[in-house]
Amino acid sequence: MKRVFSFLLTLCLLLTALLSGAALAEGSTQITIGLVGEPDTIIPYMYTADKDAMVIMQMMPYLFKRNDETSIPEPLMLESCEFDADTLTYTWKLREGYTWTDGEPLTIDDVIFTLNTLASADYTGGASTNVSSIAGYAEAHSGETVGMSGVQKVDDYTMTVQLSAW
């Protein structure tokens, strides 16, 4: 009898421990992530460690997402993404309806600002390699120009990105 009682008590304690964090309060917007250390930054283009990325990835959507089955990037925040192989130029059309936390609309100007920030001579983060194949990167990164020549606004929700090489 003692063994049965001990087993049931152990099982109850184990189930309590396993299920203690399983339910969220209705309407809760809190997320809990187990990390090996405290994030150094939550600025998306300034992170260098996986622990930072784990938090940042929960904060906002991205222009592209990785297809879980094929590992090929697919548009997420983009309504369309077209590529012209002759000119090595992408045309990105941002989905309307995204807003900043203050309610202001997210426009293609914000995307262009971010890409040019990553190419800037003043940028010290590790993500500049993400834009290094865009035309005009070398000039922007050296401080010779402000912004990349391969990044052009078409309208408030559309832009072109020309690569420097394939």
What are these regions (language model features)?
Residues 34-85, 116:
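N-terminal lobe/hinge region of extracytoplasmic solute-binding protein
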Residues 1-9:
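Positively charged n-region of N-terminal signal peptides that target proteins for export
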